[in-house]
A protein has these predicted regions:
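Basic- and hydrophobic-enriched, low-structure N-terminal and domain-boundary segments
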Residues: 1-186, 190-193, 246-247, 531, ...
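Residue-level marker of intrinsically disordered, low-complexity segments enriched
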Residues: 5, 152-154, 550, 567, ...
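Short alpha-helix boundary/capping motifs
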Residues: 14-15, 70-76, 401-402, 505, ...
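Short amphipathic alpha-helical patches
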Residues: 33, 66-70, 220, 291, ...
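P-loop NTPase motor domains
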Residues: 39-40, 44-52, 117-122, 161, ...
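Short, solvent-exposed helix-helix connector turns and helix-capping sites enriched
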Residues: 71-74, 87, 257, 317, ...
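Residue-level signal for threonine
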Residues: 138, 303, 565
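Conserved ATP-driven motor cores of ASCE-family P-loop NTPases powering translocation/secretion/packaging/pilus
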Residues: 474-476, 480-590
Length: 630
């Protein structure tokens, strides 16, 4: 492969040879002169024909029957001799010839001007992409992204038409995921979250810190969009919250029961997503799996609070509790779990193994494992949380498969955010795992069995800690009808939770950004805009400054620079706020879509849009909808 071919792509093509502007000018003028001569020749032949090829016109170059071919400029000589004749035929012929010459010369002048302009543009084009071809998307390029369509997708910003000064909302309706960089108090709620929730007609799971999204969007989603509006607020004491029991999602008495419980207990003993790093975590997880199976099979309180109550029962010590598991008949249906020798075993083998494991440990180790396990379940000792996780008023399966779409708001007061995080993490984990377990295929293509798409609107996403299932499955959950909209403050926040080798960012097809506060994010966004080629003009003067002999020479030099430098990214015009900190005017933003030119956009303000404003005024339900009681 030669060097030119190695540099040729749809984005940039290296010129084969540098062209001299002077040579291009001479070529253009030569063509223009040739055209003038052809025009004069046409005038000569026209006048000769009008005058009947009279012998007085002189001898022609060539005679072809009745046609005579004269020299190109002969008509000018004829005009000098006979223009004063009072013959209308003669004067008319010369008059028309002059008009023909004038019109033709004008056309040639236009051709010359166009050619010179085109040559200059080609010369500039050869150099303007030399160091990089980055630029902001034009109207056609914005349209090419598909974001200006009239679908029902999520809002990612707006684009202002420079010519018509008209704002165009940008919506992404594809299955791909969206990530937004938006610092606190930057207007992400009024510009991204609320417009999306006030228009998205399908199911949604919304991580709603402060409950603002429930208050402003659940009314419209329930009343106008035909959704079930469910609010799960674990710390609610007024009865307005739906209840959710994570253990109700376990498929008891199936081959999946152990895997379901293991997934739940792994999330419980790993509240920050750092993995099972020590002996106590691993032992606690194994113990809780066994105890959970016993509770689901044999205890009355089949909840997480029921597990901690069983482990901390003041009427018996740990050894008696473990022996109780071994002595319990879990096989009430008579299906049996045979022992290796074929004899019947009526105690669940996984529960029995966990209990026997604990009895075989030394007293100090056993005490440490029990203490660790109970510590992980302390949250569920709170009577409010215990009450709100006692039964399930909805099931994970309902989110995408109920007759109507379901909007689930995970409402967490800021004061309880850290305390309730393990429960919210557990629920999101169950959503992702439960709705991406099975895919059907027909005629060589995947077929989704769900009735509704599901939007995962997760504001302050990194605050949930590392969700391994999310990072692992983000690449394929779109195929199951799940679309993630992840909002983070800056890239370092994501790196803190997932490490610099994370794959969350790369699996988001659309990235939008408000003015960042951290230089790491600004540098990343600057690199994402790309490198542009800048043409620098310089002038030099010689001779007397005011004299007629002064000479001016101009030179151009191409250099590179980022389309936006890091400091320019940090200085993106932010939203204008009043004295109370409320947003009054939209700021600027950046919109990136894989495979497309970056868009310099404008923020949306939902309260300045009559449609959004009217929808936000629909009152939220006083109580959450209930789909089931299990």
């Amino acid at each position: 492969m030669n060097e030119r071919n190695s540099l040729t792509s749809p984005l940039y093509a290296a010129p084969e040879k540098s062209r001299n502007p002077g040579t291009l000018l001479l070529r253009t003028l030569a063509v223009a002169l040739l055209l003038v001569m052809v025009l004069c020749w046409i005038c000569t032949e026209y006048v000769g024909a009008r005058l009947g090829y009279q012998p007085a016109l002189g001898a022609p170059l060539v005679s072809l029957g009745r046609f005579r071919l004269y020299m190109p400029l002969d008509w000018i000589e004829w005009y000098a001799h006979w223009h004063a004749l009072a013959d209308p035929t003669v004067s008319g012929a010369f008059h028309n010839a002059f008009w023909l010459l004038l019109a033709g010369t004008g056309a040639i002048a236009v051709f010359v001007a166009y050619s010179l302009k085109r040559n200059r543009e080609q010369l500039e084009l050869e150099s303007e992409s030399l160091h990089g071809s980055a630029h902001w998307a034009s109207e056609k390029e914005v349209e090419r992204t598909g974001l200006m369509g009239k679908g029902v997708g999520v809002y990612v910003g707006a684009w202002k038409d420079a010519h018509a000064s008209r704002m165009h909302y940008l919506r992404h309706d594809g299955p791909e995921h969206v990530m937004a960089f938006a610092p606190t108090r930057s207007g992400k709620g009024v510009g991204l979250v609320l417009p999306t929730l006030l228009s998205w007609p399908h199911s949604a799971v919304v991580y709603d810190i402060k409950g603002e999204n429930w208050a402003l969007t659940s009314g419209w989603r329930r009343q106008e969009a035909g959704n079930h509006a469910i609010k799960f607020e674990p710390s609610a004491i007024d009865g307005s919250s739906a209840r959710f029991n994570p253990l109700a999602e376990v498929r008891v008495r199936t081959d999946r029961e152990v895997a379901d419980i293991q997934n739940i207990m792994t999330m419980i003993v790993d509240p920050d997503g750092k993995g099972l790093q020590d002996h106590w975590q691993k032992s606690s997880q194994a113990l809780l799996v066994g105890v959970a199976l016993h509770v689901l099979y044999a205890e009355r309180d089949k909840t997480l609070n029921g597990i901690v109550a069983f482990l901390s029962d003041p009427t018996r010590d740990v050894q008696k509790a473990m022996q109780f598991i071994l002595d319990t008949d879990h096989d009430l249906t008579g299906s049996g779990w045979p022992n290796p020798d074929g004899s019947p075993n009526y105690c669940h083998p996984v529960a029995a193994a966990a209990a026997r494991d604990m009895l075989n440990k030394a007293d100090e180790e056993r005490s440490g494992v029990i203490s660790s396990a109970i510590a992980y379940l302390t949250l569920y000792r709170d009577p409010i949380v215990a009450r709100n996780t006692a039964v399930s008023d909805f099931r994970i399966h309902d989110l995408m498969n109920d007759e109507k779409p379901v909007s689930l708001y995970l409402v967490v007061p800021p004061s309880d955010k850290d305390r309730l995080r393990p429960l919210i993490r557990l629920l999101i984990n169950q959503v992702v795992r439960g709705l991406t377990e099975k895919m059907e295929f027909k005629d060589g293509r995947s077929v989704t069995a769900h009735k509704h798409r599901l939007l995962l609107m997760l504001d302050e996403f990194p605050s949930l800690g590392k969700l391994d299932v999310f990072e692992e499955s983000l690449a394929f959950i779109a195929g199951y009808g799940l679309k993630a909209y992840l909002i983070i403050q800056d890239i370092s926040q994501l790196w803190t939770a997932y490490g610099k080798d994370e794959s969350i960012f790369s699996n988001c097809h659309v990235r939008v950004a408000y003015a960042p506060n951290k230089i790491e994010t600004a540098e990343l966004l600057s690199k994402m805009t790309g490198t542009a080629t800048i043409v620098k003009h310089s002038h030099s003067y010689s001779g007397s400054l005011y004299g007629a002999q002064s000479n001016v020479s101009t030179s151009t030099q191409e250099t590179q620079r980022p389309l936006l430098t890091a400091d320019e990214v940090m200085r993106l015009p932010a939203a204008t706020k009043d004295a109370r900190g409320n947003v009054t005017e939209p700021g600027d933003m950046l919109i990136f879509m894989a495979g497309q030119t970056p868009i310099y956009g404008k923020q949306i303000l939902y309260f300045m849009d009559p449609t959004f404003s009217a929808r936000a005024k629909i009152p939220a339900p006083e109580k959450s909808d209930v789909l089931s009681g299990k």
